Amino acid sequence: MLGLGAGAAAAASLAGCGGSTGSGGTGSGGSGRTGGSRGGDRPGKPKPTKTARPIGDGSTAFTGKQPHQPSRPVPLEPGQTPPQFVVFSWDGAGEVGNGLFPRFLDLAEEHDAHMTFFLSGVYLLPESKKRLYDPPNNPRGASDIGYLTDDHIKDTLKNVRRAWLEGHEIGTHFNGHFCAGSGSVGNWTPQQWRSEIDQAKSFVKEWRTNSGWTDLPSLPFDYDKELVGGRAPCLLGQDNLLTAARDLGWRYDASSPGGLQVWPSKRQGVWDLPLQQIPFPGRSFEVLSMDYNILANQSVNSTNAPARHHPAWREQATQALISGFKRAYETNRAPFFVGNHFEQWNGGIYMDAVEDALKHIAREKEKGADVRMVSFRQFTDWLDVQKPEVLEQLRTLGVGQEPAGGWKGFLGGSGGTGDSGDTAGAGAGTGAGTGAASGA
């Protein structure tokens, strides 16, 4: 059972990503002047170099194969124990002066981990140009996460650039993060999702034109090719989003409103990689593997609860993540997916919990465990080279279920390659408990 307990209503109302990172709704509440080119001036396009070929207005550039990638994945051998994959992901991925983006880039570098950063497109759009954004079923320029200041856009660009160069994935969290009312993303059609995706991509691909800044380097990737998956705001609207994602050739989606710790399958031809229910220490129910869902079960509707609670809550959050990892690693080896936000909720205890959990996992790896901290894209690369019948066999293992007779006998058939298809498999439930859709 997935329980949000008393926090369910709070989670649904605040919708996880928190408006504090932006300027607040559609107004101009952000600190500092937001820019954009003046007088219609078009910024100068960077010239090609030996290492970079500008794309479009030079906001992005082709710089070759992404560095710091794992070796090419191979199929499991007959009887081989699957690796334990762990994916840490971040919704929004804006750097707003709290230093959290570079903090976790440093942590990942220290422990040879790769992550996925689901960038909100409007985080690269100056507020002065907000009317370029035409969100489905919402007023032009509206955004429930606001807009960043000029300085914060520049900081975000700097960290997104660094992230890609260090081997991390840049996905999308789309744009305005609408979770309630008639304009909610949960009501969008496939065509409206396509519009939202096209706009999110344009804000990444045209930040130079929209800002007027000519003194910053290009983002070192082709976003049309880089973008192969995302996570929807509040985990809403996945069914229609999948139609758009499939038509765009996306390889995965991380928007499911709640899953279990089992091996994934495809929906509509797209890998469905959900947040998962994990043990919640001291409670009789489980919680989704995302910082905000843990918060909702601790401080209900407050992101700034009394500090006296913080030490115990930090430990509970840390142990929830470690317990989720251990349950998978010691049993069915299902991939472990963790979602987060660059937020200082309740004194930053959830950021500390993520760091503590990642360090715990890294120590297990250092002891010799076959643990791989990867991005969603890298994990999808591995899935796509496995033989369909091997993945189908893995899906027969339920939550916390060890293979009968050990891995050698369980996967003793032939290995190989091939497309995995849209098989669900035993135990691959969705776990759509109360309030499950509220934490992203």
Question: Which residues make up each language-model segment?
Answer:
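Short, low-complexity, disordered segments immediately C-terminal to signal peptides
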Residues: 18-46, 423
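Well-ordered, non-membrane alpha-helical segments in soluble/globular domains
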Residues: 100-102, 149-157, 193-198, 314-323, ...
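Active-site cleft segment of glycoside hydrolase catalytic domains centered on the general acid/base Glu
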Residues: 180-199
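C-terminal domain-boundary segment and adjacent tail
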Residues: 61-62, 69, 80, 252-264, ...
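Active-site-adjacent pocket scaffolds in enzyme catalytic domains
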Residues: 44-48, 52-55, 59, 134-139, ...
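N-terminal export signals
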Residues: 1-19
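Long, low-complexity, intrinsically disordered segments
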Residues: 422-440
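Active-site beta->alpha N-cap acidic-glycine motif
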Residues: 55-169, 176-180, 203, 207-243, ...
